[in-house]
Amino acid sequence: LGLNIKVIDGEKEAYFGGVAASNLLHDDTFVTVDIGGGSTEFCFVKNGKIEKSISLNIGTVRIKELYFNKNNIDGAKKYILDNLEKIFKLDVEIPKKVVGIGGSIRALSKLIMAKNQYPLDILHGYTYEVKNEIFLLNRISKAKNCEDLKSFGIKKDRFDTIKEGSFIFKTILEELKTQTVVTSGVGVREGVYLTDLLRNSNHKFPHNFNVSVKSLLDRFQIDEKQSAYFGNNAKKIFDSLKPFHKLDNKYKELLVVASKLNSIGSVLNFYKSNDNAFDFILNGLNYDFLHTSRVIVAYTIKFSKKSLPSQEDILKHKDLLPSLEVVQWMSFMISLNIAINQDFSRPKVEYVLENKTLKINLPNKSFLIESNIDKIETPQ
């Protein structure tokens, strides 16, 4: 076939995992942990830059054959701790956040999501606190037989090494004093690709570039100039109304994203376009987005051009959303943005705040725009 096959060592494997996580997750300071059959890879990332990579001879199959099959749990723990000593000799600050890569850690995250009845069926970016879930990891590692594993909801294809994987992960989390785990749906494969793609930019996307937003715009935006206008106007509206809504600037970024992507639903199907966009956004903003952020963007689009959402409207995802007041302000601002450019003329608008009233100065009087603005429900 003419394939050029390269064999990489464990340190390089760890590096590739770090490249994938640093580009495709929202976090910028963490250590990746990739538990395999024969080894576990660690990559330390600080402020978005990879500092150190290391591979240790700790793997599920190795631990199973050397210790678990002989019921030597104490020996397994000592073996893992002895190997982890190499990490403390790296002269690197150990983060409180672990990014989990690989099948064992993803399988454990799925169990935790199911146990907690998590409202999104999305693994990449799923985050949990170690103190809340360490007990479950401990119970899985002590399972007596397949029936015990089955009772946890573990799938049959994971029976062989899930106990060992859970034991290794639990021991690592405790020894590194980890507080938070972020689940990664990407790993070595994506890291190899990104390392080649970004070879001239230190293996990092530009600071203001989001691969998910770019992908959705490339596939579904109706007009590039319209998308850019909606994004720029969103910033102006947010800043003009800041004395009223008093929202953190992180919501401005999300309002810009929602405004740029608001036409996706119409491209998919004109009827119920907002509902179509809602489902699509939840699953489409895969990379470099917190779960909370993608839910906010989805709800902002869903309630554009509509009456303000009620508490009942956001009930399903309330644990991932800010207060109802914040959601209503986001809904209002995107609705105002869309109304101002209802005829796609991209008017040059001036916003003036006087006596607690927002004045919108348009270059030309438009009955269509004015009537649509009048229909928008305002937050209290």
Where would I find each of the regions flagged by the language model?
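Helical "lid/coupling" subdomains associated with nucleotide-phosphate turnover
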Residues: 1-23, 27-29, 44-46, 52-342, ...
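Acidic-residue sensor for enzyme active/binding pockets
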Residues: 13, 41, 377
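Acidic, divalent-metal-coordinating active-site segment for phosphoryl/phosphodiester hydrolysis
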Residues: 38-44
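Short, solvent-exposed amphipathic alpha-helical segments in soluble enzyme
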Residues: 114-117, 375-379
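A short interface-forming secondary-structure element
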Residues: 359-376
